[in-house]
C-alpha cells in the first residue's frame, strides 16, 4: 500500500472514533439494546434450524425480534448522541447504516432467491453485510467506554456479544450445536469443532485479561456467550437449551476460578497456564455435555475413553500456545 494511501486510511479510521459516553444510565441502555438485538439474531437462527419448512417469507416473528432490536439500538444511540450534542459520523453510525442496507438487501434476497438453508445463511452477501454492521455497532459500545484501561459492564457485554457473534457466524463449527456428529462416525469433523471453539475461548481470555477484567466480569463474559448459544435451541429443544445454560454456568465458574488464580499468583507463565486451563476446561465440560446427552437420548457415543480424554488434553496444548500471544516476545513478560 502506498504511504500516502496508508496515512489517509489511518486518518479516516481516526475520523470514525466515537465520543466517550460516561453516563452510567446511558451505558445500561446499550446493554438492554445489545441483548434485545442479538438474542433476536439467535432466535432467528433457531427458526432457520427448527422451523425452516415453515419459513416462506422475510416477514417472520423471528425477524421482527431481530430488527426491532436493531431499531431500538439505533434509537438508543440517537438519544445518547443527541443528549451529548454529538453529531459526528462515527463507527457506530457507519455500522448502523451498513446493517440497515444489509437488512433491506436481505429482504430483496429472500424475495428473489428464497430462504437459505444449511450454511448458506451464514455466508450470503446480505448476511455478511449484517455481520459487518453488527460488529461495528458493538465496537461503538466498546470504544465509548468511560475508561480506556478498564471495562465497565456495557463493555464486557459488548465483548461477550462480539465473541458470540463470531460463534454465530461459525455455528456450523460449534460442538454444542453440532454435537450429533460425535454420535456418528465423522470423528475428524467432530474433533475439529471442539478444537476450534476451545482455542477461540482461550484467545478471548488472553484478549480480555489485558483489560484487567475482574473474575466476576470474566464469568459474565463467558456465561453470556453460552446464554446466546443456548437460544439457538429455543424453538425446538428446550431441554438442550437448559443443558447448554447449565454447562455454560459450570464452565464460567471455572473461568472465574482461573482468573482468581491469575491475579494472585507470581507464576512467570501464568498467562500461558491460564489460557491452557480455559481451553482444557472447555473440552472437559463439553465431554460432560456429551455424556449427559447420551444418557438422555437413544444416541450411542462412538468415542472411547482415550478419545474423550484427547478432547480435554489437546485443547490444553493449543491453549498454552495461544497464551504466548499475551507475552512480550523480547522480555517474555505478560503484556499489560
Residue spans for each PLM region:
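N-terminal signal-anchor module of multipass membrane proteins
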Residues: 13-72
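Aromatic-anchored segments of alpha-helical transmembrane domains
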Residues: 36-42, 98-108, 160-172, 221-234, ...
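Membrane-interface interhelical loops and short amphipathic "cap" helices
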Residues: 43-64, 108-125, 171-189, 232-237, ...
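C-terminal transmembrane helix-loop-helix hairpin of multi-pass membrane proteins
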Residues: 241-250, 257-336
